[in-house]
From Swiss-Prot:
Listed GO MF terms: 1,4-alpha-oligoglucan phosphorylase activity; thymidine phosphorylase activity
Gene3D superfamilies tied to this protein: 1.20.970.50, Nucleoside phosphorylase/phosphoribosyltransferase catalytic domain (3.40.1030.10), Pyrimidine nucleoside phosphorylase-like, C-terminal domain (3.90.1170.30)
Record's GO cellular component terms: cytosol
Keyword Transferase carried by entry: yes
Cited PANTHER family: THYMIDINE PHOSPHORYLASE
Keyword annotations: Glycosyltransferase, Transferase
Protein name listed in UniProt: Putative thymidine phosphorylase 2
Enzyme class: transferase
Secreted listed as a keyword: no
Length: 512
């Protein structure tokens, strides 16, 4: 819609000149923001100030955005701009007429305040909050407050069930004709550990149906969707997903493109910035996606270690109890598998580097990390048994045979081809080794420092960034031997990451 096509006044449509959209190319990472000049007549007439929540309309499309004020030369008084996500949502073009008005009051904020003060919420209150979040009515500061108010055990099991249900209702829900629809998920917290694509390929080669949808990274250097995106197309529609699964029996796609529990993707974006992931949010995030995807049998991998997300067995027991309670409310069958979370799994940490590990394992090359292969075969075997595709006690052997025969690799190729084609992951421009300060034995590797180093290098936003592990616990090293190699796409990020790595040693070496 161009300015000369419609003389629509801002606000209530009386007495103000229309605002004309001017693209500025500002990326706020999915947060809707509108930019106006401080002396804009609409601001003066309506009393708008910076950080006000306003309703923005272009034609028939509208959304709620946060107001930022910017002056000349970026904007004149009769111009308005939008963040990239808001412009995309409104399909805005240069010259479009923009109308703004006061945003409607949000009744759910009362429930949010109650939760901040430690009160229990009922299902209707939680549903109202999630409904407003998924509709884009909450600014990030409100979402942050909700996440913080629910963290550290502040949400009980009944609330967690209600949260999960509200998140399922916030989007679409898939259904399948198969009695058993398998899935595999890892709670995260362990750098590398990209077993899911390998497990899906093995299990699908063994006859299971796995419409696998994955999230992007929350607090880690890569999520399964981030990693798979370096290999194939992951943003599929529901119709495309169904076609892929009907054709090859499995998928490896990003759940965010399917409108499955869309509130979860918004929460994940803010959780990533806060670097938090509470039990209640973790359970609701995982299980809402599984319910929405139509899964019936879910294997959940839980790495346990002193620097993993789940640090002790008692934490695992608490998480498993919550998972089983919520899963039972939705008729889901779950199998929790405790795995070693004392050190990173595989060599690559970061989307492209982890993708290379996946290819090496599936192609059975000499470069395949043995630990990643072993863990993947064990989990795939457990899933085959859990879903009745292998006799009890015979799953791991069956999984190993499916991998060694090349059946899993052929299935993975088929999945990627069905999703748009298989491509080779890229490589970073800059690399630098972090070396051992002295000779000795590696006695520990700090997962959190490793993950932080990889993220400072640019992962997961820069697909080729991250780090490559050169040692494992119990390895003997000499002075000056590389412990890991940092990969970055910008020299500044390389320096930043390496400075952190040197100031916060991730690899503990006991001198001889």
């Amino acid at each position: 819609m161009q300015a000369n096509e419609l003389k629509l006044a801002a606000g209530e449509g009386q007495g103000s000149e229309p605002l004309i959209f001017k693209p500025l190319g500002i990326d706020t990472w999915q947060e809707h923001v509108i930019y106006l000049h401080p002396d804009c007549p609409v601001c003066r007439a309506e009393g708008f100030t910076a950080q006000a929540r306003v309703q923005v309309r272009i034609g028939e499309a509208s959304l709620i955005a946060t107001l930022n004020l910017v002056g000349a030369p970026l904007l004149d008084t009769g111009e308005a701009s939008l963040s990239a996500s808001a412009a995309q949502a409104l399909e805005a073009r240069a010259g479009d007429v923009v109308a703004i008005s006061h945003a409607p009051a949000l009744e759910s904020v009362r429930a949010l305040r109650a939760k901040i003060y430690g009160r229990r919420l009922d299902g209707a209150q939680i549903d109202s909050i999630i409904s407003d979040i998924s509709a884009g009515r909450y600014p990030d500061v409100y979402i942050s407050a909700f996440l913080a108010a629910c963290a550290d055990g502040r949400m009980n099991r009944r609330e967690t069930v209600d949260l999960t249900r509200a998140m399922v209702h916030s989007g679409e829900r898939l259904s399948w004709s198969h009695a058993v629809v398998a899935d595999k998920h890892c709670v995260g917290g362990l750098p590398g550990n990209r077993t899911t694509p390998i497990v899906v390929a093995i299990a699908a080669a063994g006859g299971l149906v796995l419409p696998k949808t994955s999230s992007r990274a929350i607090t880690s250097p890569a999520g399964t969707a981030d990693t798979m995106e370096t290999l194939t197309r992951v943003a599929l529609s529901a119709a495309e997903l169904r076609h892929v699964v009907e054709r090859v029996g499995a998928s490896l796609v990003w759940g965010g493109a399917l409108n499955l529990s869309p509130a979860d993707d918004i929460l994940i974006r803010v959780e990533r910035a806060l670097d938090i992931d509470s039990d209640a949010q973790l359970v609701a995030s995982i299980l809402s996606k599984k319910v929405a995807a139509g899964s019936t049998h879910i294997l959940i991998d839980v790495p346990v270690g002193p620097t993993a997300k789940v640090r002790e067995d008692r934490d695992l027991e608490r998480l498993e109890a919550a998972m089983r309670h919520v899963a039972g409310a939705f008729g889901l069958h779950i199998l929790m598998v405790r795995t070693d979370g004392t050190q990173p799994l595989g060599r690559g940490i970061g989307p492209a580097l982890e993708a290379r590990d996946i290819l090496a394992v599936l192609q059975r090359t000499v470069a395949a990390p043995p630990d990643l292969r072993e863990r993947s075969v064990m989990l795939a075997g457990a899933l085959l048994e859990f879903c009745g595709a292998a006799p009890r006690g015979a799953g791991e052997k069956a999984a190993g045979q499916l991998l060694d025969s090349g059946a899993a690799w052929r299935k993975f190729q088929a999945i990627c081809e069905a999703q748009g084609g298989l491509r080779v992951p890229g490589e970073a421009i800059f690399r630098r080794d972090i070396v051992a300060p002295h000779a000795g034995k590696v006695i520990a590797i700090d997962n959190r420092h490793i993950a932080r180093t990889a993220k400072l290098a640019g992962a997961p936003m820069r697909q080729v960034a991250g780090l490559e592990m050169r040692v494992r616990v119990n390895d003997e090293v000499r002075a000056g031997q590389p412990l890991f190699t940092v990969h970055a796409q910008a020299s500044g990020e390389l320096d930043y990451s390496c400075s952190y790595a040197l100031a916060h040693p991730a690899v503990s070496i006991e001198p001889h």
